[in-house]
A protein has these predicted regions:
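Structural signature of extracellular appendage/secretion-system components
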Residues: 1-489
Length: 489
């Protein structure tokens, strides 16, 4: 009977091994398309299925089920992914502006050339009503196009500010969730288990990856398996089972984000007011989406400032040469424009900045306006009329507009070159990180990814193991029946 017991025990151990293998293979196949899933590998060995010295022989048993994972590759992958996310956010935020630079229908080049061409036409025939009307229309088109470009850039900047709020909120939620996972990881080790469950570790890595994408913090793993999150300056965001909190630093009357994140403790019943720990700077200490948005907002502000300077230079170049003289219409009346309060101010240039109906708070909107609503508002002369005198049209006024062409177009070209160069640098940065990301993704896939062809082979292997051990148990049952029949029972 000891022999029958041995055969039965060996077969049963083999069946259990096959069942575990089939279950693990099924889990791998199911998790193949799940983000953050790591392949489980079965490590079998041939050993005695029991410690009973009466049982002889060996069977295939499971030594361990191992989660395929590399801490080094994971850390490298997340570190590069945070940089890739930052550069991608930068480039994507600037896509609209980049398109405007190459699209003549929304860019400045065509309308600026149109303005100076109409200036030249008017200088050639300053008394022509049609030339004066065309010049007035061209000046309005140029002012509107500059405003449109400035407004578009400012809108992308405001959108970046809004996304900073969202990212800070999401990062706080993910950090708290990761701290809770760390508690479970720590608890599982406390109960004498050699390792936490593979599913729990997958969740840990998934949460860590999301934090790296949002704020680009560095992920470090403790000996217990906890994931710690630290910024580039060493400031902790998640330290074991404790998660800190991020708050956007703001400034000015408009309460706009500055790109700095304040790190504080979590509010508690005992201490409802969070205690400040330190701060981190977006784009320097904080990468990921937040870093990209911070860098873009800073660049957009610089673009707007330089575009504003271009407008100021253009205003100066197309203003009256003699501060004491007044621009007058054909009848000799001073040219004026009306303000919102009903008062009037002299027209002293082809363009002006309209700030009467707006409040500029921590923003740099450009409200450039043309002084010429129609051809009749284009200055005829700068000389004062009297009752007995009349004066011919003053050609020098329009000639001063024409003379400003080279300086203005050069300023615009320099602006385009600077902005295009910066966006091009971001694109090259993004391409560089994409290449590294592809290599690290391939490496991580080799270590922890699921190969469906390999799993199909494993499935067949464990099916055959199941069938073979099933046959062993059937043989034991038949032998038992024969022995029973021989003994007359």
């Amino acid at each position: 009977m000891a022999g029958l017991t041995t055969i039965h025990t060996v077969g049963l151990a083999g069946l259990r091994t096959a069942q575990s293998g089939l279950s693990t293979t099924a889990g791998n196949v199911a998790g193949a398309s799940v983000e953050g899933f790591h392949r489980r590998e079965i490590h079998p060995l041939i050993a005695s299925p029991t410690t009973d010295p009466m049982i002889q022989g060996g069977s295939v048993v499971i030594d361990s089920v191992v989660r395929s994972w590399s801490g080094l590759v994971t850390t490298q992958y997340l570190d590069n992914r945070s940089k890739l996310t930052q550069s991608s956010t930068l480039f994507e935020s600037a896509t609209v502006v980049d398109q405007m630079l190459v699209d003549e229908s929304v860019g400045l080049t065509a309308v600026m050339n149109g303005f100076f061409s109409s200036s030249a036409d008017l200088a050639a025939d300053p008394a022509s009503p049609s030339a004066r009307t065309a010049f007035a229309a061209a000046s309005r088109a140029l002012a509107d196009r500059i405003n449109t470009l400035a407004t578009t850039i400012d809108e992308t900047r405001v959108r970046a500010f809004s996304d900073m709020d969202r990212i800070a909120t999401e990062a706080n939620q993910k950090a708290s969730a990761l701290a809770r996972v760390n508690v479970l990881v720590q608890s599982s080790s406390a109960f004498g288990k050699p390792l936490p469950s593979a599913d729990l570790l997958d969740e840990r890595d998934r949460m860590a990856g999301e934090l790296a994408k949002l704020v680009g913090a560095k992920i470090e793993y403790s000996e217990k398996g906890e994931a710690n999150v630290r910024f580039a300056n060493g400031m902790s965001f998640v330290d074991g089972v404790q998660a800190f909190r991020l708050e956007l630093a703001r400034s000015g009357a408009a309460n706009l984000p500055t790109g700095v994140l304040k790190v504080t403790t979590q509010p508690t019943k005992e201490q409802p007011s969070p205690m400040a720990i330190g701060s981190v700077q977006g784009g320097v200490d904080v990468l990921g989406e937040f870093g990209g948005l911070t860098r873009y907002a800073e660049s957009a502000k610089d673009w707007l400032g330089r575009l504003g300077q271009l407008a100021v230079d253009m205003m100066a170049a197309t203003s009256k040469a003699d501060p004491e003289a007044l621009w007058r219409d054909k009848e000799g009346n001073p040219l004026v424009r009306s303000l919102i309060d009903g008062s009037e101010v002299p027209i002293e240039g082809a363009f002006y900045v309209d700030s009467e109906d707006s409040v500029l708070i921590d923003r740099v909107p450009l409200l450039l306006r043309s002084s010429f609503g129609s051809g009749t508002s284009v200055p005829w002369s700068a000389l004062e009329y009297n009752e007995t005198s009349s004066y011919p049209v003053d050609q020098r006024i329009v000639q001063s507009f024409v003379a400003a062409r080279d300086a203005t177009t050069d300023s615009w070209s320099n602006w385009v070159t600077a902005v295009s160069g910066e966006i091009g640098t971001w694109k090259a940065e993004k391409t560089s990180f994409e290449g590294v990301d592809s290599a690290l993704t391939e490496r991580a896939q080799q270590i922890s990814g699921v190969d469906l062809d390999e799993e199909a082979t494993n499935l067949l292997k464990f099916q055959q193991l199941y069938q073979a051990n099933g046959s062993v148990m059937q043989a034991a049952i038949r032998m038992f029946d024969v022995l029973m029949s021989l003994s007359g029972r």
